[in-house]
Design a protein with these regions (language model features):
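P-loop NTPase motor module signature
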Residues: 1-192
Length: 192
């Protein structure tokens, strides 16, 4: 090689967390939810309306899944078989932006999800104390945490106690519109 044989080799042993991916259709079916059904998209609905509608439907589906996770049998069907019963089972939700985080938080409040979970937003506009609160696992809490954040947290933050992740599969990207000569955030599907 370029540096000869003197290049030190470093091995960092890590224990990966077992991950199981479940599509929304599978989760809805397993939960036997009657609150939510997936509707076909119309080819005639304008794209911007489709995004807004999809975001609303995704929020409703998220609330349905959060409620269903309180059922022990349903929860067990989603977890790896070797998960200990005493393990915290907090939920991390990835939403596309701050407005969607706030909308989902309000929907959780309206649907009574906050009786089951401590619903905690996590984004850059919050002060340090609010961010710290979302990232700290309470020692003696009967409730699970549901931390709602943007995909920025995927690579920069570890949220302890999380066993379930709900990802809308959406992100916001800055896009320049030459017609209006302005830049705006466009919600689009993530590539992964």
């Amino acid at each position: 090689g370029f540096f000869g044989d003197r290049t030190p080799h470093l091995h960092v042993g890590t224990r990966p967390y077992p991950v199981r991916v479940h599509d929304l259709e599978e989760v809805i079916q397993k939960s036997r939810s009657t609150e939510f059904r997936i509707e076909p998209w119309s080819e005639y609905v304008p794209k911007d309306t489709q995004n807004a509608r999809f975001e609303r439907e995704a929020s409703r589906a998220c609330v349905s899944v959060l409620k269903a996770l309180m059922d022990a049998d349903f929860e067990a069907s989603l977890l790896p078989p070797d998960t200990e019963a005493s393990t915290r089972k907090d939920v991390l939700v990835f939403a596309p932006g701050v407005a969607e985080i706030e909308e989902l938080e309000n929907l959780c409040r309206k649907e009574g999800v906050q009786r089951l979970y401590d619903v905690l937003p996590l984004h850059g506009a919050l002060d340090d104390e609010q961010q710290r609160h979302a990232l700290t696992t309470p020692e003696h809490s009967e409730k699970r945490r549901c931390v709602i954040t943007t995909n920025v947290a995927e690579s920069s933050v570890t949220v302890p106690g999380v066993r379930f992740v709900i990802d809308f599969g959406l992100e916001k990207l800055p896009v320049y519109d030459p017609r209006t000569r302005t830049q705006a955030l466009l919600t689009r599907h993530c590539s992964r």
